[in-house]
Amino acid sequence: MPISKIHARYVYDSRGNPTVEVDVVTELGLHRAIVPSGASTGQHEACELRDGDKTKWGGKGVLKAVQNVNEVIGPALIKENIDVKDQSKVDKFLIDLDGTPNKTKLGANAILGVSLAVAKAGAAEKGVPLYAHISDLAGTKKPYVLPVPFMNVLNGGSHAGGRLAFQEFMIVPSAAPTFSEALRQGAEVYQILKSLAKKKYGQSAGNVGDEGGVAPDIQNPEEALDLITEAIEKAGYTGQVKIAMDVASSEFYKEDVKKYDLDFKNPESDPSKWLTYEELANLYSELCKKYPIVSIEDPFAEDDWEAWSYFYKTQDIQIVADDLTVTNPLRIKKAIELKAANALLLKVNQIGTLTESIQAAKDSYADGWGVMVSHRSGETEDVTIADIVVGIRSGQIKTGAPARSERLAKLNQILRIEEELADNAIFAGEKFRKAVEL
């Protein structure tokens, strides 16, 4: 069934910045996708095309990307008349049309919008839900696997004020029997955490960050972990709800001296207190002994390969590569060869097409890695990643706290999928790292 129209416009993301929305129209109707954007962006990821016109949106406009869809990609793709069900052919056409290694010419935000909208058109043409179409494209086995939600309940780093260097503290309800129960446990812990934060740090500590987590004025990781552990205990889930961290350590790496500054938000930070990677690795090991931590993302800077390999040898927890790999096949290959991590953070907008995202997941699975599908800090009401996480059978999703509609939209979509699949789906639970093998 041919595409009759492709139209892009700009809409706003959850931070009030413009982003790209794409409509693909076929005989079966309109299929729409909106592209997210990140705050801490890795330097090796696909190019998010921004206008750079400081007089509008502080330079963050996407009029050029929108124009590229409407004047270049749209007409060319319609003329090519590719079957919308043939996602890899569509995506290859988009990649070739751009012709640059990281989509700088047309913009990954323009290309991804079209890629995801086409996937929705393909699902409609097959008369199946999007997750089922993605499952076919990825060639994953059945039953479907519903993911463990990694919920970012406490923020630090560049996502929050306060002196806390680590960016995200997540709760992981992996001992729950079903996805809906996991979400309930997470929501209950979150509510308790919020009231504890207000009690200990004042009313404003209940204010939420970009991803819905609270951001009290916390000084160090132990303080954050104690607060979360207390919330888990008060909710009655000790031993059931685990903890994960996204350190986002590239944000506080001092490249010139190869050290990590845990007081990086303080302009008067004392260089004698900066840590070598061995000292930072030691801190993580101590935290893992003291708290129920099951996963650490970006423990070291994106080009500090030596540190990653060193830490990997000492740990059996999940070590998630995000800034290190930025969903880029070449970086993933290097990380696997150097034994730097054991899980991939999959962000579709870091690579720019659905086909490449599926391939990145498959490459990771092939080497025994886990895959965590992720939102970005600038999100929208688009729920495509919920269908992706079920379709590629990855068993883990990170999409913020159970707060703010752009975060809940994804979790609510998984609730709907759970209801629809009933006995045809299993919950990843404690086996989230190897969900693809379940």
From Swiss-Prot:
Predominantly, its location class is cytoplasm
Q: Which residues bind substrate?
A: H159, E168, E297, D322, S374, H375, R376, S377, K398
Where along the chain is Mg(2+) bound?
D246, E297, D322
**Top-level class of the enzyme under EC nomenclature:** lyase
Q: Which GO terms describe its cellular component?
A: phosphopyruvate hydratase complex
Q: Which SMART domains match?
A: Enolase_C, Enolase_N
What does the note accompanying the cofactor annotation read?
A: Mg(2+) is required for catalysis and for stabilizing the dimer.
Active site residues of this protein: E211 (proton donor), K347 (proton acceptor)
One Gene Ontology term of the molecular function aspect: magnesium ion binding
| Pfam families referenced in this protein's UniProt entry, alphabetically | Enolase_C (PF00113), Enolase_N (PF03952)
Q: Which reaction does it catalyse?
A: (2R)-2-phosphoglycerate = phosphoenolpyruvate + H2O
Record keywords, A-Z = Cytoplasm, Glycolysis, Lyase, Magnesium, Metal-binding
At the top level, the lineage of the source is: Eukaryota
Q: Which GO terms describe its biological process?
A: glycolytic process
Localization (cell): Cytoplasm
Database matches in InterPro entries: Enolase (IPR000941), Enolase-like_C_sf (IPR036849), Enolase-like_N (IPR029017), Enolase_C (IPR020810), Enolase_CS (IPR020809), Enolase_N (IPR020811)
HAMAP family to which the protein is assigned, alphabetical: Enolase (MF_00318)
Protein name per Swiss-Prot or TrEMBL: Enolase
Tell me what organism the protein belongs to. Neurospora crassa (strain ATCC 24698 / 74-OR23-1A / CBS 708.71 / DSM 1257 / FGSC 987)
Source taxonomy: Eukaryota, Fungi, Dikarya, Ascomycota, Pezizomycotina
